[in-house]
Amino acid sequence: MKIFSRLLQEAKNLFYELQAMLSSVGARVDIDTPYVCQFSIPEHAEPSLKKTLDPSADPHWKETGASSPERYAAWAFTMCGMASTAMALGYFKDKNIKPAELAEDALRSGVYSEDGSEISSMKYKEFANWVRKYGLVANVYSKLSVKGIQHALSQGKLAIVSVSPNIRGYDTAPADQRGGHLVLVVGYDRDTGTISINNPSGFVNPNSQIKHSIPVATFKKYY
């Protein structure tokens, strides 16, 4: 069964990539989505990640929709996918649902599992099924080229992609990890050779949160 599922997924990937290859995409796409940080407020992303602010002691924890400081702390470093989903919901459905509220609902629906203090990574198949309740249709691709991403955006879609967390500081941070962090791709510019992301754990200054423009060649190293 697992082999069949994998072959089916690979066929789905191939079919989509062929569509993307044969299609023409615009020179530039720039989608204005709301920005949602996976931490309490955008200014607290950097100190939280640099361990100078303990999420359980964050005075703004309620901003995420968490039910308690403890639940915010449990989710803070795992909420990138839910923050990206909240941005998509804000754009497509004009819904303002907090990321921690989405996270707890997703947990109940099997998108995540929790064992003690450990919360798993997002389960993509379960995510695609779960997000339908909010009126979104998600397609899961295990491999997607940059042209495939551009094809999706040129059709008015958004793409949540898995990248290295180090992409927020790509000019200084090593590309020694691929995947592990979810961001929302909101645009590209073929003339300048760049791709733009909304990064739920980006920093305020210099900006790596909202429409963070990255050279495609660099993006590929972290994608």
Please place each PLM-identified region on the residue numbering:
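Active-site-adjacent structural segments surrounding the nucleophilic cysteine of cysteine proteases
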Residues: 1-117, 173
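Conserved active-site-adjacent core of cysteine acyl-enzyme catalytic domains
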Residues: 5, 9, 13-16, 20-23, ...
